């Protein structure tokens, strides 16, 4: 009898302590920039150069990725701070709601392609100076919660031989 009660207590102990406590995550998505593959891109058009951003995403309710009557729409946005115009937007994969009661923590790799410089755009000019390319990246979840903004500062190499 004593061994049976010790065994029962041990099983209860394991059951109680083996359940990991869910992280306390906000329902508003949060982004963290872990790294950038390089700081400079050669200016140009149509995917001549790129950088890769390594981003950590957390979201308490996991409502990432839009599906609106089988129509996908962008949910991650990048703004060119030089012009305050959209630089690019992305459609993230939809996260199924089943099994995300504790939210999600994910790593993303985002590829940003180059574009032309503002001064003498995409025209060969060996005397042209490099340009700063400040970008703002943010995400909006299905509930409309906007994440924090990541400030990304790149350099466009505008000189071309």
Q: What are these model-predicted stretches?
A:
Residues 15-18:
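C-terminal motif of bacterial Sec signal peptides marking the signal peptidase cleavage site
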Residues 20-23:
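Bacterial signal peptide processing site
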Residues 2-9:
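Sec-dependent signal peptide recognition
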Residues 28-161:
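First exposed extracellular module after export/assembly in secreted or surface-exposed proteins
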């Amino acid at each position: 009898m004593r061994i049976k009660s010790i065994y029962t207590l041990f099983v209860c102990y394991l059951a109680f302590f083996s359940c990991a406590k869910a992280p306390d995550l906000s329902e508003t998505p949060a982004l963290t920039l872990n790294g950038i593959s390089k700081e400079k891109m050669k200016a140009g058009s149509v995917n001549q150069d790129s950088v890769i951003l390594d981003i950590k995403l957390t979201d308490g309710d996991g409502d990432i990725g839009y599906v609106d009557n089988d129509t996908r729409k962008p949910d991650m946005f990048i703004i060119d701070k030089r012009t305050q115009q959209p630089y690019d937007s992305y459609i993230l994969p939809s996260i199924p709601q089943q099994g995300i009661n504790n939210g999600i923590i994910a790593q993303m790799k985002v590829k940003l392609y180059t574009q032309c410089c503002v001064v003498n755009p995409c025209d060969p000019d060996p005397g042209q100076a490099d340009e700063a390319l400040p970008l703002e990246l943010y995400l909006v979840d299905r509930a409309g919660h906007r994440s924090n903004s990541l400030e990304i500062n790149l350099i466009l190499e505008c000189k071309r031989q």
